[in-house]
Amino acid sequence: MKSLQALFGGTFDPVHYGHLKPVETLANLIGLTRVTIIPNNVPPHRPQPEANSVQRKHMLELAIANKPLFTLDERELKRNAPSYTAQTLKEWRQEQGPDVPLAFIIGQDSLLTFPTWYEYETILDNAHLIVCRRPGYPLEMAQPQYQQWLEDHLTHNQEDLHLQPAGKIYLAETPWFNISATIIRERLQNGESCEDLLPEPVLTYINQQGLYR
């Protein structure tokens, strides 16, 4: 049986413990040995990043330098176009072949808006969705047809993620950290401490670069 590979996308502006710690727990829960972080260059669903792509790449490299679970994929940073998950997963599937189990990790907030994503219906053709639960978010989609879509693909058996190459949605019980990039940027702008929110090398780099001031 080929091992499950997971992709974790985001803006990472900046990367922080709220990104890393839930995924580390997730890896232990479901048996992931490698998580590929894929920062996006031009996110289509949110405001554009304050740090440029080179700076965000460096912050990620610093954050995962001593974490063998994580590796970095720069393909979306090299595109001068919107970063569409559907497109990236098609490429990833072509590279890995038809039989390797692949998964894309998202937060529960992203699941609720998932049907607005570009070609969202193709994503489960190429990967599973692993959803990190977040308190305060509903478990139901806004419209009945999307709720049916969720129920059609939902599994409560994590073994399905390893045995099938794609097509399942799994809700993972991961810890939630009340940390966001917005909170960090606001604290930095106000001259407040962020030592408890992100890795020390990342904070040092932010200060050296004068970011988020």
Swiss-Prot record:
Pathway: Cofactor biosynthesis; NAD(+) biosynthesis; deamido-NAD(+) from nicotinate D-ribonucleotide: step 1/1
UniProt KW Nucleotide-binding keyword: yes
Transmembrane annotation, as ranges: none
Reactions catalysed according to its record: nicotinate beta-D-ribonucleotide + ATP + H(+) = deamido-NAD(+) + diphosphate
InterPro entries membership: Cyt_trans-like, NadD/NMNAT, Rossmann-like_a/b/a_fold
Enzyme Commission numbers on file: 2.7.7.18
GO BP annotations, alphabetical order: NAD biosynthetic process
Recorded GO MF terms: ATP binding; nicotinate-nucleotide adenylyltransferase activity
Keywords: ATP-binding, NAD, Nucleotide-binding, Nucleotidyltransferase, Pyridine nucleotide biosynthesis, Transferase
HAMAP family in the cross-refs: NaMN_adenylyltr
Family of this protein: Belongs to the NadD family.
Chain's role: Catalyzes the reversible adenylation of nicotinate mononucleotide (NaMN) to nicotinic acid adenine dinucleotide (NaAD).
Protein name: Probable nicotinate-nucleotide adenylyltransferase
